[in-house]
């Protein structure tokens, strides 16, 4: 059985994952509107992935006799100046999620809740992969630039990335 402090933190993370899905879904819509179909597809997949992260946390709280509580989810930003801005914001958002996961891991360790600590290790590894992925996308912008050909190349490659 989880203590209430950990339940509250897990619920905060559930809601952050839900918000993350909405952020990527909205970014996908912006990309689609501006002709970046590869980026739109990529971000749509990531929106679905964030929902899976949320559901995994939701189920864990339920399975451990806690009560998952869905809070108010703010509307994400919906207008961007460029495709690069979309992915710069995405990288910063993933860094925020990483910091929140790390805080949660720290609380579970200090509380000697080793079961939840162990459960969260999947998220620790996942966040490492997410930051690496989005840093790599920014590296592509730096490498090929943002002219028409560069954007075409990046958009086409995004369609193939997981």
UniProtKB/Swiss-Prot annotation:
Which residue numbers delimit the Ferritin-like diiron domain? 1-145
Q: Where are the transmembrane segments?
A: none
Under Gene3D superfamilies, the record lists: 1.20.1260.10
* List of residues binding Fe cation 1: 17, 50, 53
Give me the Gene Ontology terms describing cellular component: cytoplasm; cytosol
Q: Where in the cell is it found?
A: Cytoplasm
Q: What does this protein do?
A: Iron-storage protein.
Q: Which reaction does it catalyse?
A: 4 Fe(2+) + O2 + 6 H2O = 4 iron(III) oxide-hydroxide + 12 H(+)
Source organism lineage? Bacteria, Pseudomonadati, Pseudomonadota, Gammaproteobacteria, Pasteurellales
Q: Which family does it belong to?
A: Belongs to the ferritin family. Prokaryotic subfamily.
Q: Which Gene Ontology MF annotations are present?
A: ferric iron binding; ferrous iron binding; ferroxidase activity
Q: Which UniProt keywords apply?
A: Cytoplasm, Iron, Iron storage, Metal-binding, Oxidoreductase
- Positions with a binding annotation for Fe cation 2: 50, 94, 127
Q: What is its EC number?
A: 1.16.3.2
The GO annotation for biological process reads: intracellular iron ion homeostasis; iron ion transport
- What does the subunit comment say? Homooligomer of 24 subunits that assemble into a spherical protein shell (12 +/- 1 nM diameter) that can sequester at least 2000 iron atoms.
The record lists its disulfide bonds as none
Please report the name of this protein according to its UniProt entry.
Answer: Probable bacterial non-heme ferritin
């Amino acid at each position: 059985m989880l203590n209430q402090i950990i339940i509250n933190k897990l619920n905060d993370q559930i809601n952050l994952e839900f918000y993350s899905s909405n952020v990527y879904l909205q970014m996908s819509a912006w990309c689609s509107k501006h002709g970046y179909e590869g980026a739109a597809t990529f971000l749509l997949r990531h929106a679905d992935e964030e929902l899976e992260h949320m559901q995994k946390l939701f189920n864990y709280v339920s399975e451990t006799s806690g009560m998952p509580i869905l809070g108010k989810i703010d509307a994400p930003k919906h207008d961007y100046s460029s495709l690069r801005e979309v992915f710069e914001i995405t990288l910063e958002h993933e860094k925020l999620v990483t910091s929140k996961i790390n805080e949660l891991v720290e609380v579970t360790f200090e509380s000697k809740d080793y079961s939840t600590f162990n459960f969260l290790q999947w998220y620790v590894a996942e966040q490492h992969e997410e930051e690496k992925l989005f840093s790599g996308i920014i590296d592509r912008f730096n490498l090929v630039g943002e002219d028409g050909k560069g954007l075409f190349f990046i958009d086409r490659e995004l369609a193939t990335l997981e």
